[in-house]
Amino acid sequence: MQTGAVGFSAALRFWLKLGFIGFGGPAGQIAVMHRELVEEKRWISEQRFLHALNYCMLLPGPEAQQLATYIGWLLHRTWGGIAAGVLFVLPSLLLLIALSWVYLVHGQVAWVAGVLWGIKPAVAAIVVHALLRIGGKTLRHPRQSPLLWAIALASFVALYLLALPFPAVVLAAAALGWIGGRVAPAQFSPPATQAIAAATAPALIDDTTPTPAHTRFSRPRLLRVLAVGAALWLLPMAALVLWQGWGSTLATMAWFFTKAALLTFGGAYAVLPYVYQGAVVEHGWLLGPQMIDGLALGETTPGPLIMVVAFVGFLGGWGQQVLGPEQLFLGAALAAFVVTWFTFLPSFVFILAGGPLVESTHGKLHFTAPLTAITAAVVGVIASLALFFLRHVLFPDGLGAGLWMALDRPALLLAVAATLALVVGKQGVVRVIVLSGLAGWALQALGWAG
């Protein structure tokens, strides 16, 4: 495909449309891109699409947004990639700012509280479903990959029982993968197929489309992109520090979410425990139950699930009154923009600078084995997140009254029903959340919930 074959304005319209219809998490968003770009519009070959997808699966960050950035870059160079990545995120950012405001201002209204109460068990079910789905794909059979199972179990123990820092778990898993790739290479080889590639596996190696000149590795270009990326990080950070000080809420958010962006191997569910640990426990920007509400809002809006960080930023900016008590909305919206900027900036740098570099190492075990181990650790991370959500949903007042007396039975019924709908009924996430919210409203109206 020639890079100029698709009009830039036509591409912009598609990326904006994708930003509004990108429901269903990364799998759904990638499926939409595949259907529209490969099957219908034929803007990109099957081989090139799958090769781009492999790129993004190896990187930290939201793979669907990175895939959009990569394809935009492939079609229209650097500005095409930037436009695709920004338009993929912008609609969900604006929607979440609006919904976060409604949540804070009207969240205590009886019917709104009932809907939010009903959504929480569905969110817990979604995380359990993610655990089953990702665990099944990653760990395979215990006899086939016992070391991966051991890494997943150790990750769970480290996070849930020992409360070790998430970055330490990721680094330890990478080190074990590096060693395991040499000691037991068969166990640390990545799965041969991915969701979209399963039916067309030969396309992964039958890449006959010529590589555009601007995608070939060049050391001077790499240094230029890294320098621009560093400036785009350093200048806003310096401005925040000079304006409000290093210990200010906005500067702290910028630094914290920069670190979070570099640890999102395995998707949003993998980094949420780290976000919870920092945003709820360490900094107090929001409460644990509010974090669950934010995840529900993130699941019901288009765009990457990691956009839940905009909700965290909005609530933190509102609660900390970053622009004073008379400008709560403006300060909260600014915090949401700051958090989003520092969360997604690394993804643009990874694609625009590191894409050719990652492609040159594709299929080499010394590079993929640490990532395979990190993915196994992610299963343990998601298990700890699932237990955290279940504990807060099923025992909202703690266990002081005893296990049975403290149990929220209607919440348990909703959680079981939502889990069955997702796992057995194969229902979509948005439908399950909407129905759970309606059930919560009905139960609250009857006086049986909340």
Provide a role label for each language-model segment.
Residues 1-59, 63, 70-301, 305-450:
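Multi-pass membrane proteins that catalyze or facilitate reactions on polyprenyl-/lipid-phosphate substrates
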